[in-house]
């Protein structure tokens, strides 16, 4: 199992009841995907295991999962803070021009005039648009608004993002 091709979709927040149910916080914009899962990969501190989904219920802001082989609260407690993952091939397709955050993190960011700025290290979700955090050896931390006027191209195969800096975003 190649963990480089796995994507986190939930985090285990605790147990529920005595029969081995696990409380999961969704880490996806598509929690409805949970109802279509037959199996998931549980990552507990780097140790991976595949588990069949025996039951699922929505509960407040959580989802309650019942997995094959996890039948008691004692066994379930061993998965506290574990991560539910799926293979990258199982991701929902996004419209053209949209990307999952994990696909953008680590891209080299190039300005059309200044050349290489640095690496996209984080994404801040705001109400209006995302903001990309670029770690630049030359300019320090640069905050780039994820808007069409700024983002010119995203080339995942080349691990490259091309942008047009707005005036005032960095000091010359």
Swiss-Prot record:
Residue intervals passing through the bilayer: none
Location in or out of the cell: Cytoplasm
Pfam family, one: PRC_RimM
Gene Ontology MF terms in the entry: ribosome binding
Keywords (A to Z) from UniProt: Chaperone, Cytoplasm, Ribosome biogenesis, rRNA processing
GO cellular component, one term: cytoplasm
Gene Ontology biological process: ribosomal small subunit biogenesis; rRNA processing
The organism's place on the tree of life at top rank: Bacteria
Domain PRC barrel per the UniProt entry, residue ranges: 96-169
Free-text domain note: The PRC barrel domain binds ribosomal protein uS19.
Family that this chain belongs to: Belongs to the RimM family.
Subunit structure: Binds ribosomal protein uS19.
Protein purpose: An accessory protein needed during the final step in the assembly of 30S ribosomal subunit, possibly for assembly of the head region. Essential for efficient processing of 16S rRNA. May be needed both before and after RbfA during the maturation of 16S rRNA. It has affinity for free ribosomal 30S subunits but not for 70S ribosomes.
Name of this chain's protein: Ribosome maturation factor RimM
């Amino acid at each position: 199992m190649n963990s480089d091709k796995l994507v986190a979709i939930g985090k285990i927040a605790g147990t529920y009841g005595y029969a081995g149910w696990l409380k999961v916080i969704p880490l996806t914009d598509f929690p409805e995907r949970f109802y279509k899962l037959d199996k998931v990969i549980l990552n507990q501190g780097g140790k991976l295991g595949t588990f069949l989904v025996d039951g699922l219920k929505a509960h407040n802001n959580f989802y309650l999962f019942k997995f094959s082989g996890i039948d008691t609260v004692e066994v379930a407690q061993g998965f506290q803070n574990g991560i539910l993952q799926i293979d990258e091939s199982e991701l929902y397709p996004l419209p053209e021009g949209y990307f999952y955050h994990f696909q953008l993190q680590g891209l080299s960011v190039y300005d059309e005039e200044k050349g290489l700025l640095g690496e996209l290290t984080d994404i801040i979700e705001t109400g209006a648009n995302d903001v990309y955090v670029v770690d630049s050896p030359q300019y320090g931390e640069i905050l780039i608004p994820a808007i069409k006027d700024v983002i010119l191209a995203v080339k995942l195969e080349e691990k490259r993002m091309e942008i047009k800096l707005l005036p005032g975003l960095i000091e010359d």
